[in-house]
């Protein structure tokens, strides 16, 4: 019920302006835009399923130009409900790659618990992890996970994002030509007065 959510978000926003609402809805693009228009400040996206260079470029073009005024995308490489074949087959390398892309392409990104461990065993017949927290508590050995370097990469990405305000922007992204469809090149910029230098 859109009218209900619109009214609720407005009322809560007036009393608690620091509260934001995330639309955890994988639905048709028109509905995702509508959810942004009625007040949801953030939305899950189809980033997890955009793997080819042309798919990423086309999707970022749509998000940064066509829908940026209403849709605030959050890029999640995986969630408790999402473990794409790319992440299953790609193992640690895929987890590193998708973290770098999420952290640098979108102003908002998220990492699911256990991401540092590159958990990539799918539930048979589904695009989700076999033993995720939807159904049970899952203890993890994060100390042992440090060997694969993902934890340090995530730390570095957050530091880099903090140091470079352009990474907090959605609209000023430019894709650059490459001669290899396996390579993607892009840049982001901010006005001089927004720079930390």
Language-model features: locations:
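Active-site and adjacent substrate-binding regions of carbohydrate-active enzymes
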Residues: 1-197
């Amino acid at each position: 019920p859109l009218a209900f959510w619109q009214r609720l978000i407005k009322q809560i926003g007036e009393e608690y302006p620091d509260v934001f609402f995330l639309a955890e809805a994988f639905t048709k693009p028109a509905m995702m835009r509508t959810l942004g228009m009625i007040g949801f400040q953030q939305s899950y996206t189809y980033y997890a399923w955009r793997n080819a260079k042309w798919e990423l470029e086309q999707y970022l073009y749509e998000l940064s130009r066509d829908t940026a005024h209403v849709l605030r995308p959050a890029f999640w490489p995986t969630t408790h409900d999402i473990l794409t074949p790319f992440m299953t087959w790609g193992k640690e390398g895929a987890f590193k790659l998708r973290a770098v892309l999420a952290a640098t392409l979108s102003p908002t990104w998220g990492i699911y618990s256990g991401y540092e461990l590159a958990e990539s065993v799918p539930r048979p017949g589904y695009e989700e992890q076999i033993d995720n927290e939807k159904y049970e508590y899952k203890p993890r050995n994060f100390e042992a996970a440090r060997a694969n370097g993902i934890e340090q990469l995530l730390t570095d990405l957050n530091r880099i994002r903090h140091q470079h305000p352009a990474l907090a922007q959605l609209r000023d992204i430019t894709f650059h030509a490459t001669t290899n469809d396996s390579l993607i090149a892009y840049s982001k910029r901010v006005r001089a007065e927004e720079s930390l230098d």
